Structure formats: structure tokens, C-alpha cells
A protein has these predicted regions:
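Short, charge- and proline-biased low-complexity linear segments
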Residues: 30, 64-69, 128-135
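A broad, low-specificity signal marking well-ordered, structured residues that form hydrophobic/aromatic
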Residues: 5, 77, 92, 113, ...
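Generic secondary-structure microfeatures
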Residues: 19, 52-56, 81-83, 98-100, ...
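Short beta-strand edge/turn micro-motifs at domain boundaries
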Residues: 107-135
Length: 135
């Protein structure tokens, strides 16, 4: 039996799994956002660490992320808007809603995520940079 990808795309094996396994990089900011959502849903801690730069020591980030990642059950992702972030862009934003369940209570996380290219170069992969304030 084939599993659907949590991001709402296609089959996991042909959608976000190749990104999580490091077989390819996200071609767009939206694809990185979707793959990060799937990584949260599936507990792919290393992928989340690799796709978000931070001055915080890696061991601490890994420990904190591993402790928090199982507290929510991610239900559904809805992309609301995408600005730039294409194959020929250096930055872009993705606004989304991520629906979740926490101890039997349903919730929705809304965010506008800023993405940029590592090294500010088209030859480099996309990274999650920060959450922007929603208007």
C-alpha cells in the first residue's frame, strides 16, 4: 500500500520523501515549505534542521525539536498565497494554514514564511528563514 504525502501532494515516495532522504533539493520555496510540513508530520528532525539556519548550537536545536515534534498531530496543509520563490528567484514567501490536533483539541496555525537561497545563489538550495508577521 502506498501512503499519501502529508503535504497534500502525491504519493509520499514521489513527493517529499526524496527531499527528506537528500536525493534532491526543493526546486521552489513552496516545495520546501510543503516538505518541511511533511517533515513535522513525520518526525523528520534532521531534515528540519538542515533546512533552517540558526545560530543556536545544533545539538540543542536537535534536542528541543525532537522533544516538541510529537506534541501535535498535523492533519492538513492549505497554501493560501505564494509570492516569488520560483526556480529563478533568490527569495519568496508562502502563506499557509496548517491544521492540527493537540490532545483532542483542533487548531490552525497560520503563517507567512520567508524563504531564501543558501549563499544567496541560484545554485544553492532553499532554506526557511523566518515567519513574517501576518497582515
Amino acid at each position: 500500500m502506498q501512503n499519501s504525502c502529508p503535504c497534500g501532494g502525491f504519493l509520499y515516495s514521489s513527493c517529499c520523501a526524496p527531499l527528506h532522504r537528500g536525493e534532491r533539493q526543493a526546486a521552489t520555496a513552496e516545495q520546501l515549505m510543503r516538505s518541511r510540513y511533511s517533515a513535522y508530520a513525520l518526525g523528520e528532525v534532521e531534515y528540519l534542521l538542515q533546512t533552517q539556519p540558526s545560530p543556536v548550537p545544533l545539538a540543542r536545536r536537535r534536542r528541543e525539536l525532537a522533544a516538541s515534534i510529537g506534541q501535535l498531530r498535523w492533519q492538513r496543509l492549505q497554501i493560501l498565497a505564494v509570492t516569488d520563490g520560483g526556480p529563478h528567484d533568490l527569495s519568496g514567501t508562502v502563506t499557509f494554514e496548517a491544521h492540527y490536533d493537540a490532545a483532542g483539541q483542533r487548531g490552525v496555525m497560520r503563517e507567512c514564511s520567508l524563504f531564501g537561497r543558501a549563499g544567496n545563489s541560484l545554485d544553492c538550495g532553499w532554506l526557511y528563514l523566518e515567519a513574517l508577521e501576518l497582515a
